[in-house]
Amino acid sequence: FEQQQIHHCINCAAYTGVDKAESEKEKAFLINADAAGNLAAICKAHQTQFIHISTDYVFDGTSSTPYKEEDRISPINVYGASKLRGEELVFNNNSSAVIIRTS
């Protein structure tokens, strides 16, 4: 960051083993939550726009209609909980970050 003039950073890195996360909770949270929060803080310090890719697993999957940003979040597994914690840390560390939830 200090040697390059980076304007945008898109975080696509993730622990993606949805089922395996149940037995590797610490690893899932380290990658999906802690690392995302740290990267968001670094981007803020360098005035770099941070864009974080998250997931619809932050919801419980019971809605019969597409989810909206303001819908209640309620992850039902470790993977979803780790991605939700990542979103929280991203916004706590960089309030101008953008989060995109994919499905």
Residue ranges and their predicted role:
Residues F1-I31:
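NAD(P)H-binding glycine-rich loop region in Rossmannoid oxidoreductase-like domains
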Residues C9-A13, F50-T55, D60, I100-T102:
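SDR active-site strand-loop-helix element
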Residues I10, A36, A40-C43:
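Hydrophobic alpha-helical transmembrane segments of multipass integral membrane proteins
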